[in-house]
Each structure stands twice: as structure tokens, then as C-alpha cells.
């Protein structure tokens, strides 16, 4: 009887979470040199050059999970950062938001090509992806090629362009914000901690894919 009750409670949490709105804010920024104080907002199909510096800021629901994944121009995968919901998950309806930097200023290196970034935000744990990346990081080159296919398949599971029953909508914020508060310290409002866009999903999944054209 206790097992049945526990299982029912678990299902109630999962179903309840899926019915909640889910979404995150992000800021994908670039600058020409590390010492530059001029930040540029990046979006899908933006052009970057070798030597440019990139930064990613994320604001997400504290009771959710986030994976930020990078696929290089030569097809290598890297889990840039991930955040897991607290284990003592109490009330996902509180809508508390956590802001953090998923990628600090990092220069983009050759070769040129398409640089792909995936932002995945879910209420359910991203356990499969996390385990695949652990194996990928330890595997030899030949093994990584096989695991890369499995990683992409796992990513595609959350991609609304591939899964017809999913939907995510991204839009630019009217004003850049820092930690959830409008920032007025600079003329253009864009500082190192700014988030500039919002992605809203449904059924417990929000997904954003950004491809940068590296020249």
C-alpha cells in the first residue's frame, strides 16, 4: 500500500509540473576582445569571428533543470553547464528564479563553421543527457563519435522542430535585465550580466537552439 501511495504522489508531482508554465531568460553576448567594454547581443544566425569572446547568462525557475550544450564546428559536444532542481523540491508553483552565468567570457577558436548551442529547461531531471556526457568525456575518440549520435538523439527529444507535440517560443525583451531587474548603468543597458531574451515552453519543456555563423 505504501508503495502505491508513493507512486501516486510521484505521478501527481510530474503531472502537476508538466501543467505549469515553464520558461527561461537568456543573454548571449559577444565582444571583440577580452578588455572591450562594448557588448553585442547574439541571436540565431549571428555572425562571429575567431578571437571574439562569448558569454551566456541564464535566468530559470529554481525548481527546474537546465542544460546548456555546445556543439562545435567539427561536431564535438560539450556540456557547458547544468543546474538541477533542489532535491527537497517543495513547491514548483513558487516561480522563484535563479540567475547565473553558464559560460563566462570565452574566446572562439578556429576552425570556422557553424557553432551550435542548445538551452534545455525541464521540470523532469535530464538524467539521460547527464549520463551520456559523463561517458562522452571519458571515452576515446572512436567512442565519442558513437556517443555523439546518442547525445544528439537525446537533444532532439526536446526539440520542437523535431517533436511535433512540443512548442517553444523565443522573443527579445523590451529592455535587457540583470538578475531580474532593469539595468540603467550603461547607455545601451547591456552589461556583462544582462539577459536579453525569453524562451517560453509548454508541457514542462522549454528549448532554444542557437546557431552562430563562425567566419
Language-model region placement:
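Sec-dependent N-terminal signal peptides
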Residues: 3-16
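Secretory-pathway glycoprotein ectodomains that are cysteine- and/or Ser/Thr/Pro-rich
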Residues: 17-55, 59, 65, 69-215
Amino acid at each position: 500500500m505504501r508503495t502505491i501511495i508513493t507512486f501516486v504522489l510521484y505521478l501527481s508531482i510530474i503531472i502537476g509540473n508538466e501543467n505549469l508554465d515553464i520558461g527561461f531568460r537568456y543573454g548571449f553576448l559577444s565582444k571583440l576582445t577580452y578588455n572591450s567594454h562594448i557588448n553585442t547581443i547574439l541571436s540565431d544566425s549571428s555572425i562571429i569571428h575567431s578571437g571574439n569572446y562569448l558569454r551566456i547568462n541564464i535566468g530559470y525557475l529554481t525548481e527546474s533543470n537546465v542544460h546548456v550544450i555546445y556543439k562545435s564546428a567539427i561536431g564535438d559536444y560539450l556540456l557547458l553547464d547544468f543546474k538541477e532542481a533542489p532535491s527537497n523540491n517543495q513547491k514548483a508553483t513558487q516561480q522563484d528564479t535563479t540567475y547565473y552565468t553558464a559560460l563566462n567570457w570565452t574566446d572562439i577558436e578556429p576552425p570556422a563553421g557553424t557553432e551550435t548551442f542548445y538551452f534545455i529547461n525541464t521540470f523532469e531531471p535530464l538524467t539521460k543527457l547527464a549520463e551520456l556526457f559523463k561517458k562522452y568525456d571519458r571515452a576515446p575518440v572512436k567512442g565519442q563519435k558513437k556517443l555523439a549520435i546518442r547525445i544528439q538523439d537525446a537533444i532532439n527529444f526536446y526539440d520542437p522542430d523535431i517533436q511535433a507535440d512540443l512548442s517553444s517560443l523565443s522573443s527579445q525583451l523590451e529592455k535587457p535585465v540583470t538578475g531580474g531587474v532593469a539595468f540603467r548603468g550603461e547607455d545601451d543597458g547591456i552589461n556583462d550580466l544582462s539577459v536579453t531574451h525569453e524562451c517560453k515552453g509548454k508541457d514542462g519543456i522549454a528549448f532554444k537552439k542557437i546557431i552562430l555563423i563562425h567566419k
